[in-house]
Amino acid sequence: MAKKVTGQIKLQVTAGKANPSPPIGPALGQHGVNIMDFCKAFNARTADQEGMIIPVVITVYADKSFSFITKTPPAAILLKKAAKIAKGSAVPNKDKIGKVSMQDVEEIARLKMPDLNATDLDAACRIIQGTARSMGIEIVQ
């Protein structure tokens, strides 16, 4: 018989740098999960993506065990890295703060494809372009 699920926790954690301090500690502690076990497993799984912010979905079971799924980094993080900017524009319709090429958008869309609600690469590219537009990043051909 399958284990009974008692909770699901969604966090965004820097790859390879999970530690028991907030926000991870309190989120896992209230579900009774062994925090250090999660931190060690997460850091081992994300060691190759050092420094990126990785969304993680942790499923907690009745016996206090857990499993977790790591997702791809958020599109906004990948776009900021491609445009070499620190943060998005405060007024994206007026101030364009960076530029990315269509090739960069396609590369990000390919990377994000498993997590996007898109059936083909063209639809995924349009989703990434929308994110770029809302951040004040201009797309050049």
Curated annotation (Swiss-Prot):
It comes from the Bacteria. The keyword Repeat does not apply. GO terms for cellular component: cytosolic large ribosomal subunit. One or more lysine residues are methylated. Forms part of the ribosomal stalk which helps the ribosome interact with GTP-bound translation factors. Part of the ribosomal stalk of the 50S ribosomal subunit. Interacts with L10 and the large rRNA to form the base of the stalk. L10 forms an elongated spine to which L12 dimers bind in a sequential fashion forming a multimeric L10(L12)X complex. This is Large ribosomal subunit protein uL11. It comes from Desulfosudis oleivorans (strain DSM 6200 / JCM 39069 / Hxd3) (Desulfococcus oleovorans). The gene is rplK.
